[in-house]
Design a protein with these regions (language model features):
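Membrane-proximal intrinsically disordered regions of secretory-pathway and membrane-system proteins
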Residues: 51, 195-201
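Catalytic donor/gating beta->alpha subdomain of glycosyltransferases that bind UDP-sugars
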Residues: 34-38, 43-109, 178, 182, ...
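Loop-to-transmembrane-helix entry motif
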Residues: 6, 10, 110, 114-118
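Long helical/loop segments within the catalytic core of UDP-sugar-dependent glycosyltransferases
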Residues: 1-36, 172
């Protein structure tokens, strides 16, 4: 929420929390496609019509944790794929000549964050090329391989119960990276995106 507080001071937040947000009635668009992310789009719709979306620090919402890492993975894939599809639907908001710093905030906070998973394969390839050029650097890709293997073990362990922290953190990071890849494939593939009933809080 710290980032959203900064965005509010800077002008407008670029995405609302689906569990806890409100929008003015005359800005609400009932015709908005159901398979897109309405909470994310609410901020974009407000900005398009000359309003801004803000984060209220005094608002408190308790959100239960996902029951397992697999559920968290599915949640990440779903929300990211819907977010990407929504951003494409409202892509003109990325035009800095029309929407100024909001376009920059939208690209840096959303699009760049949804591309973070690309750093994993890029790092592995880069380390492999470095080691190929100079054998002294072979420990680096080897360490990366071990880290990824530990992540897989942590993810697998979470299906049996609570994983030790040394395994849980790499498992969570790996699940997030794989979810990023899966979300992009789903969004680019044009597959229908699930519509679900939000958890009551």
């Amino acid at each position: 929420m710290w980032v959203r507080s900064l965005e509010t001071r800077f002008g407008s937040i670029v995405g609302a929390s689906g569990c806890f947000y409100a929008i003015r009635r005359h800005l609400h668009r009932p015709d908005f496609p159901a398979d897109l992310s309405r909470d994310f789009a609410s901020c974009i719709i407000a900005r398009r019509q000359g309003y801004r979306a803000v984060s209220v620090d005094d608002a408190v919402c308790y959100v239960p944790r996902a029951g397992s890492l697999d559920r968290e993975y599915r949640r990440k894939v779903r929300t990211m794929a819907r977010g990407l599809s929504t951003l494409w639907h409202e892509r003109e908001l990325l035009n800095p000549f029309r929407f100024g710093r909001f376009a920059w905030m939208l690209a840096s906070h959303k699009l760049v964050r949804w591309l973070v998973w690309l750093t994993w394969p890029a790092a592995v390839v880069g380390l492999g090329l470095l080691a190929w050029a100079d054998p002294r650097f072979w420990p680096l890709p080897a360490a990366a391989g071990v880290a990824i293997a530990v992540g897989w073990v942590g993810w697998w362990w979470s299906r049996r119960g609570s994983a030790p922290r040394l395994l849980a953190l790499p498992g969570y990071a790996l699940a997030g990276a794989v979810a990023g890849f899966a979300a992009w494939m789903r969004a680019l593939g044009g597959a229908p995106l699930a519509v679900w009933e939000p958890t009551r809080r």
